[in-house]
Amino acid sequence: MIKAVLLASSMMTAMTAAPAAVAQVDIITVTSQKRAESIQDVPISIIALGTDKLDELEISAFEDYVKYLPSVTFQSTAPNATTIYFRGVVSGNDGNHSASLPSVGVYLDEQPVTTILGFLPIHIYDIDRVEAIAGPQGTLFGASAQSGVLRIITNKPDPSGFEAGADLEVNTIKDGDVGYQFEGFINHPISENAAIRLVGWYKRDGGYIDNVLGSRTFPTSMITKTNAALVENNFNDVETFGARAALRIDLDEDWTVTPTLMGQKLRSQGVFAFDPQVGDLDVNRFEPDFSNDKFYQAAMTVEGKLGNLDLVYAGAFLKRQIDSNYDYTDYAYYYDVLFGYGAYFYDDMYNLIDPTQFYQGDDSFTKYSNEFRISSPQDKRLRFVAGFFQNYQRHFIHQQYIVRDMNSIFEITGHPDTIWLTEQKRTDRDLALFTEVAFDITDRLTLTAGVRGYKYKNSLVGFFGYNASFSPDVFDMMGMFVRDGTGEAACNGAPPIVPNSPCTNLDRTVKDTGETHKFNLTYDVDDDKMIYVTYSTGFRPGGVNRRGTLPPYVADELVNYEGGFKTAWSDNQFILNGAFFWQKWKDFQFPILGQNGLTEIQNAAQARIFGFEADMTWAPTDRFTLSGAFSVIDGQLTKNFCGFVDENLVSETDCPQAVDNPLTDGDETLPPEAPSGTPLPVVPRFKGTLTARYEFPLGEFGAHLQGSVSGQGSSPSSLLAVDQLILGNQASFVVADFSAGVGKDNWELVAYVNNAFDERADLFDFVACAIGTCGSRAYQGTNVPRTIGVRFSSRFGVEE
């Protein structure tokens, strides 16, 4: 594709000088199979957005480009708290610090950047391409690639010549605030064999949610809480700033070393959802809401040759720190309304107090990974890639829920005013050996087989819960033991292992081994068309349930059967690709909110997902391009989810109508929490996008007009029948974006309007605590309202 350095100069010059003519679609080179090849030669369902496309679509963040990836859906509570899904592989309620690992792997170049609270909120600038690889990629990418892989590939240092660029942008949101960003890069050759590339950015996203005046009266104490001191319009603004530096050294003709260092800080205020009961884009928040998220990553890639074999080493070290504060008034209010919990909150003089809670979090991540792989020449009839992968990630979790002026008898030891404390260390480790072998049976028929053997070990240790006085051991009137207390009462004298914890009531480890497989048969109909069939599997490691009465959850497996095609017509004037898939999700991990709002994970039997996805690009002339993509996905349970396990600790499925509850000696009956046939949540049956771009001369300038439409159908909010009844479906929506620009030589000026018709997209419906408690007040996560902006870009340097 045309590189960023030519975005204004070559493109605008060509548009000015040349009449309309038949064109070709630019074919992107990808590395989704651990080697560079044309996207049209890869027998995988993949969509890639190259440098030009990222610039044309005004993309700077995940929320900007996910619209153009029809197989990808997501849930997001903040710009730095996003969980993504491929092809409908979602059960809901993901992203908790003590819950399942993600089912999608996210990579920055060669290094995985997925953490338990979601992937890094990487700013998109000076990026070569974004690759969305659908379906299990368990042989080449491993544990975090159960349903797909998202790869962000940066532009690399280039010793062949000097390049530089700068971009300035300002925008305004309808009934919201002003935003702006400054970005720039320099590629500077040091010698014929070395170059350095420096990239920097600052971005301010204006707010659009208003914290309006409101109050809550707690029925037990009749104390009224008001948010008058926190009332503010457009209070959810975001600042993002960071830099990236990469050095390339060609040691000789065969060996190259590329170290990279990247750092970013994101500061957000407010919340990114509104309360329809309060008003459109309005909320009532009674405590400050903010998050400070910073990370840095040091990485190194070494590429070389040993004889006719290609060798690659990729290693990375990542540190991430998230400090946050959030209002938890809904929890306190509804527990008082429904259960009278306000009676437990009084000061040292035993006067009832305001029971409002707020949350303070301090999450510290350390992650490092190493991969070594070797591959044979790709022009041979028999070829292979093989390697070793090691990954380690540690998460120190500090989360405390604070009630001001609470009686000290109920405080967590060493933590004033803290009603609930989580001080835990989570460690996830995995090792793998992998190989993939391809054999050309004929000139047109290729068989590929791959296997990955893995070993994981995951642990969770530390403290969670209440003070022993607030949640003690329980005895009946005869002094007979009824049940254990929680929190400090459950420590039983175990000393603290995690710093700042009062004691230890959780210390559990799970480990397992296994393997994933892939078989692919590809037939080249001719030089421009292929068809393929694939069988592949992916997995997600098991883990620890922090509630001690629950068993660990085991690894879940995704089995994928896929048939696809890739075609180019009329000398690459028209590209059409597609894939049919049928997936079986075995023992899938299902997180629910249990007692005290604790996340519990069970393996919920089985689900099936089938669908079709396609993308196309048409360039009838060198001035006009039409591109689009869509997916149709249907996923549902194939067995009941009863909500408890049998005597063998296996999720119970035999509850067609109602069954005795074994946890209460059978004195009540329970229907299935999610009956067989229940649709999987969050993912719409249809998601699609269409973009048209027309480039033309305008006097001595080059100009363009562009419009894009993206949308999706409705989707269930939850897998659980009761929760779905309360939350309902997430509504369908369609969003339109338009832009127009002019440029000459090395500059371009673009005006744009995003969400032109001010559509209020229903992206995520949720409540602040367990739905049975807080379900009468649901929040809606939404997109940014209509945004009008102007961007100026300039590029310097000669590519050739």
Name these PLM-found stretches:
Residues 96-97, 103-104, 109-134, 182-184:
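Short acidic/polar hinge/loop motifs at secondary-structure boundaries
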Residues 709-720, 741-800:
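C-terminal beta-signal and adjacent terminal beta-strands/loops
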Residues 447, 582-584, 603-719, 791-798:
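Gram-negative outer-membrane beta-barrel transporters
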Residues 174-269, 296-297, 365-391, 425-438, ...:
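Transmembrane beta-barrel wall of Gram-negative outer-membrane proteins
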Residues 208-234, 269-286, 327-360, 400-423, ...:
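Solvent-exposed loop segments that connect transmembrane elements
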Residues 183, 301-329, 524-540, 554-641:
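Membrane-embedded beta-barrel scaffold of Gram-negative outer-membrane proteins
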Residues 248-253, 262, 374-377, 389-391, ...:
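Structural signature of Gram-negative outer-membrane beta-barrels, strongest in the C-terminal barrel
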Residues 62, 83-85, 107, 120, ...:
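N-terminal periplasmic accessory domains that precede
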